[in-house]
């Protein structure tokens, strides 16, 4: 490794000063709203079963117990919500072993996670909109459903499409090398959304995409009026995904079902299964209040607010320099 220049920070020092100022302003924003800042562990007895995450693991020296670096503070924060702590947010480090390369990823990154009890998805999106407008100084905001986005940009209804129709689109766009015979409709939709719809979100509007298909719910609740969709949304700016939000699933039994399904999917993909977080499950038995939440990539948010191109321009020492 050539250390002649890698010893220096990838971010200009002036950008690190600007980063600190933005984080100060964010903390002040939440303080003025009466939203409590919390701190939860980044080293945990459990990880998450989400198929999209490969966690970092380590062992305690004395007991040899396996521990995990958290990919998100979600479970710990929800355990606080069960105790009726009220609206909370956190700025913390998160770790994902499969997020590396490109302008927007680093295995260690800064997450802004925010939960608002007794707030439905649409009301919460408005709160998120107000916050992001404050951070990014944007004027135009657009809302579009996942279904409408597919119809608008690909002329296909994702809630009605057959697998053959999606495979034909994949073939048309020459994405065949990205799929396998066993890929589900959900996987095909994710590929098409990432490669053909997200590029169309590359403008100066803040864009909310909501009501993702039910089998892409992750830990979002299924919509009360249409069981084909979940109360999940994502927000984009200049083609960059900034945040992933839910009206949160609260039912313990449904959590267990989804966790089991996740581990089956992990094994099919050749990824190790993950023990389910028993502390989190126990908290759910006490009752998670109705709430909405979002995880925002803070490095990306700062990058965009400073009109920069990569998160390495706002991180002191990314993975190749640390």
Swiss-Prot record:
Keywords: ATP-binding, Ligase, Nucleotide-binding. InterPro entries: Aa-tRNA-synt_II, aa-tRNA-synth_II, aa-tRNA-synth_II/BPL/LPL, EpmA. GO terms for cellular component: cytosol. Its EC number is 6.3.2.-. It catalyses: D-beta-lysine + L-lysyl-[protein] + ATP = N(6)-((3R)-3,6-diaminohexanoyl)-L-lysyl-[protein] + AMP + diphosphate + H(+). One of its GO terms (biological process) is lysyl-tRNA aminoacylation. PROSITE patterns: AA_TRNA_LIGASE_II. It is an enzyme of class 6 (ligase). Substrate binds at residues 72-74, 115, 248. ATP binds at residues 96-98, 106, 241-242, 297. GO terms for molecular function: acid-ammonia (or amide) ligase activity; ATP binding; lysine-tRNA ligase activity; tRNA binding. Homodimer. With EpmB is involved in the beta-lysylation step of the post-translational modification of translation elongation factor P (EF-P). Catalyzes the ATP-dependent activation of (R)-beta-lysine produced by EpmB, forming a lysyl-adenylate, from which the beta-lysyl moiety is then transferred to the epsilon-amino group of a conserved specific lysine residue in EF-P. This is Elongation factor P--(R)-beta-lysine ligase. It comes from Buchnera aphidicola subsp. Baizongia pistaciae (strain Bp). The gene is epmA.
């Amino acid at each position: 490794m050539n250390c002649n220049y890698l010893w220096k920070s990838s971010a200009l020092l002036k950008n690190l000063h600007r980063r600190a100022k933005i984080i100060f302003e964010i903390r002040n924003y939440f303080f003025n709203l009466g939203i409590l800042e919390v701190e939860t562990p980044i080293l945990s007895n459990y990880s998450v079963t989400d198929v999209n995450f490969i966690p970092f693991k380590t062992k305690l020296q004395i007991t040899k117990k396996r521990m995990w670096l958290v990919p998100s503070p979600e479970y710990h924060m929800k355990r606080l919500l069960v105790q009726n702590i009220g609206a909370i947010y956190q700025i913390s480090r998160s770790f994902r072993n499969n997020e590396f390369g490109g302008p927007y990823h680093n295995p260690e990154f800064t997450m802004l996670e925010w939960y608002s009890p007794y707030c439905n998805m649409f009301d919460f999106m408005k709160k998120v909109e107000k916050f992001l407008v404050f951070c990014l100084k944007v004027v135009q905001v657009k809302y579009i459903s996942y279904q409408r986005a597919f119809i608008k940009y690909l002329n296909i209804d994702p809630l009605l499409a057959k697998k053959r129709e999606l495979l034909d689109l994949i073939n048309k766009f020459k994405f065949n090398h990205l799929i396998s015979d066993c890929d589900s409709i959900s996987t095909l939709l994710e590929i098409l959304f990432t490669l053909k719809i997200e590029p169309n979100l590359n403008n100066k509007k803040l864009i909310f995409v909501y009501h993702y298909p039910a089998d892409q719910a992750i830990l979002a609740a299924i919509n009360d009026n249409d069981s084909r969709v979940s109360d999940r949304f994502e927000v984009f700016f200049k083609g960059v995904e900034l945040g992933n939000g839910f009206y949160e699933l609260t039912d313990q039994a449904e959590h267990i079902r989804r966790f089991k399904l996740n581990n089956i999917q992990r094994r099919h993909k050749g990824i190790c299964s993950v023990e389910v977080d028993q502390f989190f499950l126990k908290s759910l038995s006490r009752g998670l209040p109705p709430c909405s939440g979002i995880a925002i990539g803070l490095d990306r948010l700062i990058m965009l607010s400073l009109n920069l191109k990569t998160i390495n321009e706002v991180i002191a020492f990314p993975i190749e320099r640390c």
